[in-house]
């Protein structure tokens, strides 16, 4: 029996060579594009992502001038968090954002979840420098997490549109909003940065960046990160990662070419999912059996001790391994005074494994695998895309046309490896040298996305009124091929030739404005472990090949007002969203048990809510930021499952808190800075019938820092202390609603993650 080999990202792949050749080619045509110094200055084009990164301090954090609800994170916001914190966690201070994780810095991907206005992470759009990151799910099939895509310090700007994303966003999953990240540009002068973070759970993180400075329009930086920590619970379960980022900019005239490269390797001990029953019987800190191998063997053989009641209460150990390489080549060219071309080509390669000891005997046909084999889920992604936009400034109109095309080839397979004569693995779980015992499943997918859009932005009444008229055409074809385990083959297409988006903003005066927007969108059918075809061919044939399955769609309308003064800024927005043909996974087993989940169309979901934000800056020393959101998301229909009807009409959507509140107080004086952050999240349900829920909670974090300024040859030296979960609150953080069920009467559904205890981190940073 053979196993398909998915290689780790190569050190210098052919794709990177092609991108570098393309970069040189673009540089060679610069003399033919560069504007004549003697001609009049051209009309200023809209700020590009990189330009926005350079001028974030001048951009409204409440989205002043936008026709949609938009919120931004500033560099001051980021400083309230420890170095190395996931950029997603920083977003939790914004209205409508629910971010959860099981570790203090939000880095462990198995426990990461984010939702906006009742839309889970699978139904949002994410980009880095305009390039799609897929849906950032744990078992990703079309992208990668932002933590693997870029080192946190190299992010210059983060923007959240919680309900209606920009029409040109390169995403085929953004039914409920977008999150856009922008990488920082190389600095104009030579500099070197180094920081070292030490903290709870043996955390050690080193960050380094060197900027070349700008020479004749050419500038660059190279940056690296090394992270090493133990999971906060369990026995010496490491969470390690290494990353390298590099960026090159070449500016000539009013034109720019940039190349961004990222390589990352993550080896993480997963945090196990628990149930209400496990927490009650075995405690908040329950984890893997590691290093007690005899207890794991006994449990697999039905001999239970210390409150354990089933083999599924724990496994011996589990890990996730991910290797990624991302390359982005972008060019922005002023073709004439009124015509701007922006073009991007990118490539992403991922190879990954999720390895876990399997505490059950596996039997399939004539194959029997003894308990405590290693269950290995193997992932592979190879995607390439091209996107471009052409913007024409015609009087009071800004007309933009753009397209995006992406080819995404991804694989998912699951194997069992026999550990009968092997030494138990107490740290990172790997399958090297172990005999392959069974192929549980093997599938490959080929997804092709094509998207075209047209936008007209019209300003009038002395620029007080701005109108936007947009429309896009999108189609994604997903083809599955079953290779092993009896898994299915088939094809689905999601297509809509006309998805409109309209919006308006009106300036009442220099401080106040009102805005409104309406949008329709459609999501592609997912691939990999989230695909309707991720089951046996027999099950697919019983559903007539899913020929009647409809893609998920949404219609959103929002209305709001903003005020921005020197003393304070405030915004308020109300919204209504109808989400049709919502597809949910129905778990047929719990925990790590191998089985096929079902897919149900639960009809429509209606989401209504209110979002408020208020920021007060009484003087240069104090800043008080607040956000509040109320959301009411319910299922509009019952659904059929297993020949019966599940009564969910009127029930609250899983993992959707009705009320969230965030308050952040920041102080700085001379060389000192300090901050206190508080977050509240109300009760959340984790079953479709709402028979089971987790309680709401308050969390507090704090930070303190000192800037020594110039010390000898060092331009700047800083030290900071960050406290996470200041009052050591016990709470349920992540709900793995990918494995939700209709009900959980016995409390045995293993989809709960407990939150991290109080943690502390100290960072020393220097700049040359």
List PLM regions with ranges:
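Gram-negative outer-membrane beta-barrel transporters
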Residues: 37-39, 396, 461-462, 569, ...
